[in-house]
A protein has these predicted regions:
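PAPS-dependent sulfotransferase catalytic core
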Residues: 1-59, 119-140, 200-234
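Short His-Asn-centered micro-motif
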Residues: 6-8, 32, 67-71, 91-92, ...
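Short catalytic/ligand-binding loop motif for oxyanion handling, primarily in non-cytosolic enzymes
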Residues: 14-18, 38-39, 74-76, 95-100, ...
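Conserved nucleotide-sensing/catalytic segment adjacent to the nucleotide-binding pocket
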Residues: 47-78
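Conserved phosphate-donor/acceptor-positioning beta-strand/loop module used by diverse small-molecule
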Residues: 81-103, 191
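Phosphate-binding beta-loop-alpha motif at adenosine-nucleotide cofactor sites
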Residues: 92, 150-161, 171-190, 194
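A conserved mid-domain beta-alpha-beta active-site/ligand-binding segment of alpha/beta enzyme cores
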Residues: 124-167
Length: 234
């Protein structure tokens, strides 16, 4: 059963939030990394590319929280499907977010690694991400701009406007007692208070998502294996 829904855009600290939620007992947490490391999950999501209503219990089977796209794109549907779940909207300075989002969407990584030329044991993941493109195209059209596609340049003003629209939509839709607008730089205190759990006696996890993604691309292209994205070092 979904207990915490992440409504933030990618590159708003979603990897750090995944680690934090799992530390607080709300794991496993669904993140885009789950699709990368479990290519069979693609079939759960693909019907949404054409606007079909998803069976959320099937999509989220075994997970108790979610962060990042594609789940975060469907925050409203998830909030309706799981009315007892709380929602965390991760935010950051919109212009700093844009710089990070621009890096992510222009990354060569997955797009330039031909599945046929990749090490055999990462080919299923690359093929899975290729199959995800129709859904990613929908996310880009509806969240950012009707004429924008992943891998293309998006003007800063247009992207920042989309960011502000999204934050406003979430705020306007959900009651204050169900929503936390949260910057991961705030640390444990507001998150734990909102979720009604004790504050851990350890630093809040701050994962460098760009570094995680860059290392992942490098290992996929040359290492012949999928990286441990949330291993002991994180």
């Amino acid at each position: 059963m979904m207990r915490v829904i992440g409504a933030g855009f990618p590159r708003t600290g979603t990897a750090s939030m995944k680690a934090a939620l799992e530390r607080l007992g709300f794991g496993p947490c669904y993140h885009m990394f789950e699709i990368i490391t479990h290519p069979d999950h693609v079939d759960r999501w693909l019907p949404a590319a054409t606007g079909a209503t998803l069976d959320w219990d099937r999509v989220m089977a075994g997970y108790h929280s979610c962060q990042d796209w594609p789940a975060g794109f469907f925050w409203k549907e998830l909030a309706e499907a799981y009315p007892q779940a709380k929602v965390v909207l991760t935010v950051r300075d919109p212009h700093r977010w844009y710089a990070s989002f621009r890096w992510l969407t222009s990354q060569a990584g997955i797009r330039r690694v031909d599945p046929e030329e990749a090490p055999e044991n990462v080919r299923p993941m690359l093929e899975g991400m290729r199959r995800m493109q129709p859904l990613l195209a929908r996310l880009g059209r509806e969240a950012i701009s009707p004429d924008w596609r992943f891998g293309e340049e998006v003007p800063e003003a247009q992207a920042v406007d989309a960011f502000h629209r999204h934050v406003a939509a979430v705020r306007e839709t959900l009651p204050a007692d169900r929503l936390l607008v949260f910057d991961v730089r705030e640390g444990w205190e507001p998150l734990c208070r909102f979720l009604d759990v004790d504050v851990p006696d350890e630093p809040f996890p701050h994962l460098n998502e760009r570094e995680v993604m860059a290392n992942m691309f490098e290992e996929m292209a040359h290492g012949g294996r999928l990286p441990d994205l949330f291993g002991a070092g994180h």
